[in-house]
């Protein structure tokens, strides 16, 4: 190979090697020093040695002098002797002095004068080192915490059999007897004595048609099938009864108790396999009620409540059935026959059945304004005391109640044990004043007064003392003595109600005469009465689901009672009473009826029997099939992958839905509250359960089995239309809630639990203080005041409970009674606030057990800390979601260190900052505090206050503001914000993209459009600078600019603010180009994520996420108007402002190929026709924004979004110098739009609670969207009916079967009819939804095309 040059180089000097290396690496020459002569080298060595000797001599001299000073003898002084204790004290003081000096230097207190210069030097050197090394104090970041197992996991034990010492039959019976309420131990043991075992072989019948229906059957082991006969004589299995469940009918139990027992007609139950059944005869209850008569009223009341809530809720509210639920074959009682009057009780065939509520009825068009006469029989009392005029039509309830403490006031019952009748009294929502109790009754009326009522009606009242000489002035009784008519009517009423002492009716009954067209009571009225028809008839109407029309349920004839169901249950009236022609009736108020029941409890049986007699045979069948189910806290209702065989309706309590991913990770999907429909999509589509649903707290549900639904579809095919509506509403709701334009791809929102706000549709809220310094009473009163503007609110604390229910109310023996009483209060109020004690008392435990959500309240100006009560709470499995609420003084600084508050706690679902009025922090005694808030409650709550914002969050009425991206055009956001403030629209949540994230962050920090405008104008002015961008230019590998100048401009605005420290909840959107996904930022450094959301490709480099290092770009590429994100965070209404550029859509068609020279000629030639063809840059831009455009179309067509777009198309993206012009355009546009909203009452509807306006519709979509299908497929799924079992029933007589299965003939009633197919005649076409009706005509938006469902026959 020869001698290479490489070998020669190895022998070269080291200087030459270094020279060559540096020349190759740096690309420039390095001059190497030449070798020096020998003589100068020797001279240098000599000079160095001399210097070293000189330094050594100096050091030796200094050491010698120091030693001489130490050897100098000191003058001897007196030598002292010390005792041991003095030495200990001396050295002890010396040590303590040293310790005090060291600690004082640590806390920067007064130190000695000698140490101060040292400390200053140390600090100065430390600062210099920080500047050199650029050491910065890192701001704390929010720690990612997963929800605890108690939130995401249900209990593994599904029953109490393994953990209980009681036998299974006792537990099963206890569980199923609870359907009739809680029985004390002696009552339950008395019932268990009547329990009988019954063993059945496969195919054996438990009962068959024709046999007595007088028992409750509980399955201990095996399987029972509940069957109903079909049209072809075959039996259809409508329900399978597993061990632990029961077969019973509340109406049948009521018939036995009231003494009107009937045999089974159509229902049968047989054993699907060998089974053991426990039978409890209903006669056992009669024996118990003989010993404990007060329990009778309570049990009957519970039966009525569950009949109304379970049966009517499922069949009417969700399946749309109306007059199919009531019988029309009741024979009227002729009390005062009048010739020529019809006696029919059912609607007339061929007459109009549907009445429009928007217009006037045919029969009442001319008589609606006629007066209403009534002759009253007042209660005796002191002479001369006038009675207040009463009106048949109750006035609407006030919007704001001044009740601060418990509104139920029952005189004489406080402080003592609660009896069953007391519970029934409160269930009926009766309030008895102390004055009435003391005086023996209400005050009497003055003789013969005629008063004008507010509704335009007249009341004629008189005293019984003068009635002997007075005659009846109206109706068929003209000329007869009023007293004789009144006494005869009272005798008939006493006979009907089986009142042993007729004097109980004295002073408690009013005689009324209503002119034709008068509305006696309206649907939804709370203050109801009992009406006993004497002459004429009362028509009972009910509002149809999703239509502004009413349907006639039945006609009450003479001798019938109306309104007894609402009187017994205490629930609002479920129908409207209207006198279509002149009618005379007796009226007993609810309070008077309960006074009669207190004197004679058996009266409740007669009233309940009249309700049961009105129920149709179909309702009796459904009473067997539809179950009332109770689920204890922590127990799973069903698990993911289970078979979908039923649908549930939440009656009381709260459920949580959790999904388990393929990786095994569990995530929170949503929560369900009162009135929500669960599992309907899975049940109708025959899909396995998509998630696991467990109870957050003790929950009651109505269970609608799959077989029962199939039977209803066979009997009433019009139900299919309603099911199609329900199912399409659920699926459409899921489609609207899909985040991102490509569901299932990486461009959609990751389904994390923090991206949803399950704290909505709450019924109960527990309030827990962090420390004793939190003004809990004032805070709860402020929150109650804000909630009262939304709906009835109740505040409970331990003092209120003891005052109302007695000192022993919190004892364990009273647990079931207290639970029942609290459940009543939750039913009667929109939301109940539970104020805990400052320690872990039994009341605190009860509050946490009852809570749907727990608010942890702390003081924002204190050091972040965890309270002792919270630490105790961590050791218990609390399933309710927790939210942190920090209170701040009105004039104090803004929020800080929120991250530290959150990091030291376990998982919280969210946090809120509240700016509180001064009165909340004032120190007052409880009496003075209540006196102060009495005045506060007399005023309406400010909708812009932070407590009103918290109230909207808790009730699910949050209003979100979403600001889109568009460069300088985003300055118009501030003008719209100013107009929004002037219109009085509150904002509870702010989000945005690009420039929208910048403006939104300013508004979330300032909460004032004026201050937001001032700070945004300063920043826009800096954006017009030319020098800074020029200095920021760089070599364009990734971007044209380094981003440093833009970073400084954003940092100057927000400093080191954290997103968690903003006043309003805030989020923004970025595009993660590392993971090809959309990122939603709700915590972290504010300026960084705002900058990331404003990062345009090519101009600025992507921002590195400080959390995971992912590269973040402008969120406008994927979601320029993130209204769907705000919706997923719990917003009811989203106001979305779009300022993006409008792309040209009218492009030229140039054929299959395109020549660039041709385009150049077209552009240069002034006489050629201009062509519109995008260049390469525009094509790339359009490709980048494809998903954004599609997402925008989805947002614009959604029902929850108020889409706004100012006229800003004439401004360019970088026109920041035209800030004031763009602001004025937005302001003028906002004034015009919000002015139209004010005139159209859109704002008021926006602030109205959705539970009060949308009672008939489910508020929550089901858990997961199933594969999309066409409308024909949807109809096929819903209308699919399983063939009945091939078993021919031979135990039901033809006549008996026809009584229940044949459609009734409508032969009476002036305005009710039904066509052959069962669908209503004359029904108007389905109108748009209520949400669409609220939209302002000034909005610019695009609607989804409405699809018309096919006919029921086609389905």
Swiss-Prot record:
One of its GO terms (biological process) is phosphatidylcholine metabolic process. Residues 65-1355 are cytoplasmic. A nucleoside 3',5'-cyclic phosphate 3 binds at residues 610-730. Inhibited by a series a OPs such as mipafox (MPX), phenyl saligenin phosphate (PSP), phenyl dipentyl phosphinate (PDPP), diisopropyl fluorophosphate and paraoxon. The modification Phosphoserine is found at residues 338, 346, 356, 405. It catalyses: a 1-acyl-sn-glycero-3-phosphocholine + H2O = sn-glycerol 3-phosphocholine + a fatty acid + H(+); 1-hexadecanoyl-sn-glycero-3-phosphocholine + H2O = sn-glycerol 3-phosphocholine + hexadecanoate + H(+); 1-hexadecanoyl-sn-glycero-3-phosphate + H2O = sn-glycerol 3-phosphate + hexadecanoate + H(+); 1-(9Z-octadecenoyl)-sn-glycero-3-phosphocholine + H2O = sn-glycerol 3-phosphocholine + (9Z)-octadecenoate + H(+). It is a single-pass type III membrane protein. Residues 343-361 have a biased composition (Polar residues). SUPFAM superfamilies: cAMP-binding domain-like, FabD/lysophospholipase-like. A motif (GXGXXG) lies at residues 965-970. Its main location: endoplasmic reticulum. Residues 1293-1309 have a biased composition (Acidic residues). GO terms for molecular function: carboxylic ester hydrolase activity; lysophospholipase activity. Expressed in brain, testes and kidney (at protein level). Expressed ubiquitously in brain of young mice. Reaching adulthood, there is a most prominent expression in Purkinje cells, granule cells and pyramidal neurons of the hippocampus and some large neurons in the medulla oblongata, nucleus dentatus and pons. A motif (DGA/G) lies at residues 1114-1116. The chain crosses the membrane at residues 44-64. It is found in: Endoplasmic reticulum membrane. Residues 961-1127 form the PNPLA domain. A nucleoside 3',5'-cyclic phosphate 1 binds at residues 179-306. Disruption phenotype: Embryonically lethal. At 9 dpc, embryos are smaller, and their development is delayed. At 10-11 dpc, the development is arrested with signs of resorption. Heterozygous mice have lower catalytic activity towards the synthetic compound phenyl valerate in the brain and show increased motor activity. Phospholipase B that deacylates intracellular phosphatidylcholine (PtdCho), generating glycerophosphocholine (GroPtdCho). This deacylation occurs at both sn-2 and sn-1 positions of PtdCho. Catalyzes the hydrolysis of several naturally occurring membrane-associated lipids. Hydrolyzes lysophospholipids and monoacylglycerols, preferring the 1-acyl to the 2-acyl isomer. Does not catalyze hydrolysis of di- or triacylglycerols or fatty acid amides. Belongs to the NTE family. This is Patatin-like phospholipase domain-containing protein 6.
């Amino acid at each position: 190979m020869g001698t290479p040059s490489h070998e020669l180089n190895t022998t070269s000097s080291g200087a030459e090697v270094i020279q060559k290396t540096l020349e190759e690496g740096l690309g420039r020459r390095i001059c190497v020093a030449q070798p020096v002569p020998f003589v100068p080298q020797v001279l240098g060595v000599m000079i160095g040695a001399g210097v070293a000797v000189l330094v050594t001599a100096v050091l030796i001299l200094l050491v010698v002098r120091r030693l001489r000073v130490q050897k100098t003898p000191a003058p001897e002084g007196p030598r002292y002797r010390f005792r041991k204790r003095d030495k200990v004290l001396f050295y002890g003081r010396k040590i303590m002095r040293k310790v005090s000096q060291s600690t004082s230097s640590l806390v920067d207190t007064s130190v000695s004068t000698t140490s101060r210069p040292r400390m200053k030097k140390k600090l100065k050197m430390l600062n210099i080192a920080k500047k050199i090394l650029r050491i910065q104090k890192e701001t704390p970041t929010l720690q990612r915490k997963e929800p605890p197992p108690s939130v995401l996991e249900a209990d593994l034990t599904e029953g109490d059999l393994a953990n209980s010492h009681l036998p299974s039959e006792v537990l099963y019976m206890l569980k199923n007897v609870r359907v009739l309420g809680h029985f004390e131990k002696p009552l339950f043991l008395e019932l268990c004595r009547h329990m009988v075992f019954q063993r059945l072989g496969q195919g054996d019948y438990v009962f068959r048609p024709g046999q007595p229906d007088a028992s409750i059957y509980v399955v201990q082991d095996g399987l029972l099938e509940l069957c109903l006969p079909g049209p072809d004589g075959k039996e259809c299995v409508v329900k399978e009864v597993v061990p632990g469940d029961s077969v019973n009918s509340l109406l049948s139990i009521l018939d036995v108790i009231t003494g009107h027992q009937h045999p089974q007609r159509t229902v049968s139950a047989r054993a699907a396999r060998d089974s053991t059944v426990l039978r409890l005869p209903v006669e056992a209850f009669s024996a118990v009620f003989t010993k404990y008569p007060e329990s009778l009223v309570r049990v009957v009341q519970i039966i009525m409540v569950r009949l109304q809530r379970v049966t009517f809720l499922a069949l009417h509210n969700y399946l749309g059935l109306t007059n199919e639920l009531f019988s029309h074959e009741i024979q009227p009682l002729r009390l005062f026959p009048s010739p020529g009057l019809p006696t029919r009780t059912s609607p007339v065939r061929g007459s109009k059945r549907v009445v429009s509520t928007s217009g006037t009825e045919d029969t009442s068009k001319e008589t609606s304004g006629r007066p209403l006469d009534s002759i009253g029989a007042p209660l005796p009392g002191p002479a001369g005391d006038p009675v207040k005029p009463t009106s048949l039509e109750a006035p609407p309830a006030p919007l704001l109640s001044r009740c601060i403490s418990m509104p139920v006031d029952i005189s004489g019952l406080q402080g003592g044990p609660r009896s069953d009748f007391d519970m029934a009294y409160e269930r009926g929502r009766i309030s008895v004043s102390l004055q009435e109790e003391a005086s023996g009754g209400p005050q009497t009326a003055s003789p013969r007064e005629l008063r004008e009522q507010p509704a335009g009606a007249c009341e004629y009242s008189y005293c019984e003392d003068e009635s002997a000489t007075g005659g009846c002035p109206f109706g068929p009784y003209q000329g007869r003595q009023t007293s004789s008519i009144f006494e005869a009517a009272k005798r008939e009423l006493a006979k009907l109600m089986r009142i042993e002492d007729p004097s109980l009716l004295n002073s408690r009954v009013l005689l009324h005469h209503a002119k034709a067209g008068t509305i006696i009571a309206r649907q939804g009225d709370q203050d109801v009465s009992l009406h006993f028809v004497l002459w004429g008839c009362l028509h009972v109407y009910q509002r149809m689901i999703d239509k502004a029309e009413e349907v006639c349920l039945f006609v009450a004839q003479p001798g019938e009672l109306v309104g007894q169901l609402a009187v017994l249950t205490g629930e609002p009236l479920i129908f409207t009473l209207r006198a279509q022609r002149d009618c005379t009736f007796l009226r007993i108020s609810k309070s008077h009826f309960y006074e009669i029941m207190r004197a004679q409890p058996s009266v409740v049986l007669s009233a309940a029997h009249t309700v049961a007699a009105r129920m149709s045979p179909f309702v009796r069948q459904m009473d067997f099939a539809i179950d009332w189910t109770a689920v204890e806290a922590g127990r799973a209702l069903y698990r993911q992958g289970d078979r979908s065989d039923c649908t549930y309706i939440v009656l009381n309590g709260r459920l949580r839905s959790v999904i388990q991913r393929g990786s095994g990770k569990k995530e929170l999907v949503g929560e369900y509250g009162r009135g929500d429909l669960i599992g309907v999509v899975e049940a109708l589509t025959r899909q396995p359960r998509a998630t696991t649903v467990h109870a957050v707290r003790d929950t009651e549900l109505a269970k609608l089995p799959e077989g029962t639904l199939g039977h209803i579809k066979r009997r009433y095919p019009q139900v299919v239309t309603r099911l199609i509506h329900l199912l399409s509403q659920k699926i459409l709701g899921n489609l609207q809630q899909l985040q991102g334009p490509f569901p299932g791809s990486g461009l959609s929102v990751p389904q994390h639990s923090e991206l949803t706000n399950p704290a909505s549709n709450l019924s109960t809220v527990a309030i827990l203080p962090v420390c004793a310094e939190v003004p809990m009473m004032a805070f709860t009163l402020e929150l109650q005041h804000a909630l009262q503007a939304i709906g009835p609110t109740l505040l409970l604390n331990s003092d209120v409970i003891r005052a109302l229910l007695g000192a022993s109310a919190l004892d364990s023996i009273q647990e079931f009674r207290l639970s029942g009483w609290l459940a009543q209060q939750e039913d009667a109020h929109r939301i109940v606030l539970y104020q805990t004690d400052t320690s872990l008392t039994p009341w605190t435990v009860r509050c946490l057990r009852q809570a749907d959500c727990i608010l942890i309240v702390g003081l924002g100006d204190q050091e972040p800390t965890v309270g002792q009560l919270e630490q105790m709470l961590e050791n218990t499995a609390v399933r309710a979601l927790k939210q942190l609420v920090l209170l701040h003084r009105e004039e104090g600084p803004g929020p800080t260190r929120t991250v530290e508050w959150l990091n030291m706690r376990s998982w919280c679902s969210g946090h809120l900052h509240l700016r509180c009025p001064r009165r909340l922090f004032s120190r007052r005694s409880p009496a003075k505090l209540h006196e102060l808030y009495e005045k506060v409650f007399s005023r309406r709550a400010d909708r812009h206050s932070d407590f009103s914002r918290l109230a909207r969050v808790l009730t699910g009425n949050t209003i979100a503001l979403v600001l889109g991206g568009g460069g300088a055009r985003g300055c118009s956001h501030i003008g719209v914000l100013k107009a929004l403030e002037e219109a009085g629209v509150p904002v509870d949540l702010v989000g945005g993209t690009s420039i929208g994230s910048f403006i939104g962050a300013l508004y979330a920090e300032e909460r004032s459009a004026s201050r937001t405008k001032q700070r945004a104008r300063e920043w826009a002015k800096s954006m017009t600078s030319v020098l800074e961008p020029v200095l920021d230019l760089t070599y364009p590998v990734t971007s044209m600019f380094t981003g440093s100048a833009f970073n400084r401009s954003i940092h100057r605005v927000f400093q080191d603010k954290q997103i968690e420290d903003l006043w309003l909840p805030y989020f923004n959107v970025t595009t993660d180009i590392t993971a090809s996904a959309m990122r939603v930022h709700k915590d972290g450094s504010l300026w960084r994520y705002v900058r990331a959301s404003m990062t345009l490709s090519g101009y600025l480099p992507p921002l590195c996420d400080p959390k995971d290092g992912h590269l973040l770009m402008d969120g406008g590429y994927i979601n320029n108007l993130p209204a769907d994100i705000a919706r997923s965070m719990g917003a009811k209404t989203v106001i979305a402002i779009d300022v993006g550029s409008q792309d040209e859509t009218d492009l030229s068609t140039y054929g299959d190929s395109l020549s660039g020279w041709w385009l150049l000629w077209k552009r240069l030639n002034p006489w050629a026709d201009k062509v519109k063809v995008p260049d390469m840059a525009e094509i790339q831009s359009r490709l980048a924004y494809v998903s954004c455009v599609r997402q925008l179309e989805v947002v614009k067509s959604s029902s929850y979004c108020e889409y706004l777009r100012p006229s800003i198309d004439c401004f360019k993206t970088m026109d920041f110098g035209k800030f004031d012009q763009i602001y004025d355009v937005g302001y003028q546009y906002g004034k015009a739009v919000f002015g139209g909203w004010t005139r159209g009452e859109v704002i008021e509807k926006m602030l109205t609670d959705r539970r009060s306006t949308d009672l008939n519709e489910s508020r929550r979509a089901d858990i997961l969207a199933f594969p999309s299908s066409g409308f024909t497929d949807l109809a096929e799924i819903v209308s699919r009916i399983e063939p009945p079992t091939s078993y021919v029933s031979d135990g039901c007589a033809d006549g008996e079967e026809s009584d229940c299965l044949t459609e009734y003939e409508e032969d009476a009633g002036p305005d009710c009819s039904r066509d052959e197919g069962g669908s209503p005649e004359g029904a108007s076409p389905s109108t748009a939804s209520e949400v669409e009706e609220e939209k302002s005509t000034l909005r610019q938006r695009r609607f989804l095309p409405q699809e018309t469902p096919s006919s029921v026959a086609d389905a």
